Amino acid sequence: MLYLIGLGLSYESDITVRGLETVKKCKRVYLEAYTSILMAANQESLEKFYGREIILADRELVETGSDDILKDADKEDVAFLVVGDPFGATTHTDLVIRARELGIKVETIHNASVMNAVGACGLQLYQFGQTVSLVFFTDSWKPDSFYGKIMENRKIGLHTLLLLDIKVKEQSIENMARGRLIYEPPRYMDIATAAQQLLEIESIRQEQAYTPNTPCVAISRLGSPTQTFKAGTLQELSEYDSGEPLHSLVMLGRQVHELELEYLYQFVDDKEKFKKFVEQDQEFFKPAPYVPPEDVDSE
């Protein structure tokens, strides 16, 4: 049996009771180590808490070496541990498909992830639209596929959760070209970088999916002892020191409920100023009034 087990957001003890019991009985235990990190735990503390040796599974192993993970999983129990919830990344869906093609049974044990814990910032989960990812730009590569999705969310008044890039065990182009297994230091996108990249793409596209004054909420180290929220405009957050990783960003939609707004006030520097920007943004994205089609006489 292959078990996909969510670990939650921060502590080694965030695993569910059923998840922990399952880990303890598995022959092999893998920890997916490239889409996220546990902020208050490491491999050593996990092994001590679970009482099991853990094999780190990097991107290369999961995406190209899945046969190694699935080896003998039809005869013995194998655990695949994922920070957050197992289905927070499409990579894990691919692993399940591969297992089923090999006739291996699969069971999933869910847990909290940023996708539901984001509600801790005070915004209502059913007011969120499509979630988007924001990757680190380079001098020659500045993908903007997220832009259209933000525009769609904003037009119908929904908030947008932006998941910020994580670079773990990545190679430089030069090292890849030379076939050298030398990896870059880990990098985690912070709030200021995310806001700056968003503003850069808006300056290029100029379709006004958002503006420098669009209200946002910065989320840092969600679920950890140092969890922090900061509400402000995109321009303000482009200069915000968000501290240690991990980070996410929420761009507010037009339909901000008064209870959401009241909750956000505790995270702002200037309540009246923030309220004014929210009101301006709501007016900016106010849809045009519906005009019914004219009757056309049929002859």
From Swiss-Prot:
One of its GO terms (molecular function) is diphthine methyl ester synthase activity. Disulfide bonds: none annotated. It catalyses: 2-[(3S)-amino-3-carboxypropyl]-L-histidyl-[translation elongation factor 2] + 4 S-adenosyl-L-methionine = diphthine methyl ester-[translation elongation factor 2] + 4 S-adenosyl-L-homocysteine + 3 H(+). The keyword Protease does not apply. One of its GO terms (biological process) is methylation. GO terms for cellular component: cytoplasm. The keyword Transferase applies. InterPro entries: 4pyrrol_Mease (IPR000878), 4pyrrol_Methylase_sf (IPR035996), 4pyrrole_Mease_sub1 (IPR014777), 4pyrrole_Mease_sub2 (IPR014776), Dphthn_synthase (IPR004551). Its EC number is 2.1.1.314. It comes from the Eukaryota. Pathway: Protein modification; peptidyl-diphthamide biosynthesis. Its main location: cytoplasm. PANTHER family: DIPHTHINE METHYL ESTER SYNTHASE, DIPHTHINE SYNTHASE. S-adenosyl-L-methionine-dependent methyltransferase that catalyzes four methylations of the modified target histidine residue in translation elongation factor 2 (EF-2), to form an intermediate called diphthine methyl ester. The four successive methylation reactions represent the second step of diphthamide biosynthesis. This is Diphthine methyl ester synthase 2.
